Amino acid sequence: AWYNGIYRCNDVLDHMAGADIANYDKYRGECLFLRSWWYFNLYRVFGVVPITRTVVTPANAKLIPRCTEEEMYTLLTEDLTEAARLLPSTPGAEKARVANIAAYTLLAKVYLTFGKPSEAKTALEEAMKNTAYGLETSTGKVFDVNNKMNKEIIFALYYNKTNDNGHGYWYSTSTNVMADIRNPTPEFKAIYEEKDNRLALINSYTQVSSNLYAMTKWYDTYDATYTTQVGNDFPHLRYADVVLMYAEALAESGAGLDKALEWLNKTRTRAGLDELTTGDVTSLEEFRQELADERGREFALEGHRWFDLVRLGL
């Protein structure tokens, strides 16, 4: 599926090269961002993979060798830097489209993954210049189905439950036999403090057993017309990620734990937790563990956890 997306981006980029069309820069920027998104996910899951920036036939695609680490890094950083230059500051009326902040945010994630925190810090500072985006007052508000594509959402899959354009009940609490396949475990729940208001997003409903906690982050109201669909969106990049990656970049680049904790505390205090100080977190190793736990609490079931643990060496 990822290579299908890459093929489509390459196809559009090949055909629009030199064309005189309206919104040329925006469309090119979107393709560069999406191609980078898919290549980055391939890299994080499989390591170096075959890459191409042009359309190739299926027969020729089989002949492309795996790239090197340097080639993957160059492709991602060049394309995302160009995408950030081309994309507008806001998506306009079509809110599901990406703006330049998406390119800067993904670029920062690439830099952190490749062990370049200073470059990530610079990219995130560019992202934060876009004042159209910011933290919502609570994590729950980010996922309110009546508050879709809010100011915290940077890049999300847009769903609409009408006409079967939702995502079923996969991420909504239900009683189907496989419901617990994506529910939190007791071990994961243990990283939350009891007064953390994000806990309600993974444990809102009555426990039906001592080992089951129901995920309600993507809750949508029941609709008798669309009984098998949920219309809530799925965010892949949101402003809380900008904040916590900036904390990571500060710590890893040697800017000081006090400055890093100042940014980590932004999501903690939003969740109703006390601020951490350098008396609580005394080393870079302790900070990495605290950051991993905070990212786990903030981004539960949003597809970050494994990648975070790998990147942080935990």
What residue ranges belong to the model's regions?
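Structural recognition of the beta-strand scaffold that forms the well-ordered cores
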Residues: 13, 50-52, 153-156, 236-238, ...
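C-terminal structured "cap/appendage" subdomains that terminate the fold
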Residues: 260, 264-314
